[in-house]
Amino acid sequence: MRKVLVVIDIQNDFIDGALGTEAAQGMLPRLVAKLERETEALLVFTQDTHGADYLETQEGKNLPVPHCIKPEKGWDIAPSLKPFVEKAAVVEKPTFGSLELPKVIAGLEPEAIELVGLCTDICVIANAMILKAAFPEVPISVDASCCAGVTPESHENALKAMKMCQVAVR
């Protein structure tokens, strides 16, 4: 089975930077172990990408915390994932969900798609919904143990919402 594993926004600013959380830091070793096991999966990473004008954008006005400003350190994918990034497609995205992501994944002819990453309640759920719409007949799942939300409550709420939309939560 051709499985695509989508790794959402595992970037320094979401781990221990401007928007970092203990949950994200705690999840990272589980994600590394998963990637070490998933040797047959085709990897696609997303990378939240903002410019110096972030605070002037719609997102910046609603979340006035500069983060993932290219090419600052906070924008970089976590160092522990660098060996996996070398084997992956990387999609930079200027907002929560990526309309480019389904185009990249379509070229991989997926038979299953699994998502992991940060933040469950923002970018993971946004991309899960986009992928569900783009690939209605492809099983889509989320590994909850390799995700973290802004808060534990919002993480759980996002998982419940994805389940309601027929995204399998494991």
Regions found by a protein language model. Give the residues of each.
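A short glycine-rich beta-strand->turn/loop micro-motif centered on a GG-aromatic cluster
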Residues: 114-118, 138-150, 170
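Internal catalytic-core helix/loop-beta-alpha segment
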Residues: 71-122
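Structured adenosyl-cofactor binding patch, chiefly the S-adenosyl-L-methionine
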Residues: 147-159
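Active-site acidic carboxylates
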Residues: 1-90, 156, 160-163
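Short, catalytically relevant binding-site loops at active-site mouths
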Residues: 50-52, 74, 96-99, 147-149
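Short, well-ordered secondary-structure micro-motifs
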Residues: 18, 55-57, 101-103, 126-128, ...
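A structural signal for isolated positions on well-ordered beta-strands in alpha/beta enzyme cores
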Residues: 4, 42-44, 112-114, 139-141
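Histidine-anchored nucleotide/phosphate-binding helix
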Residues: 32-36, 125-135
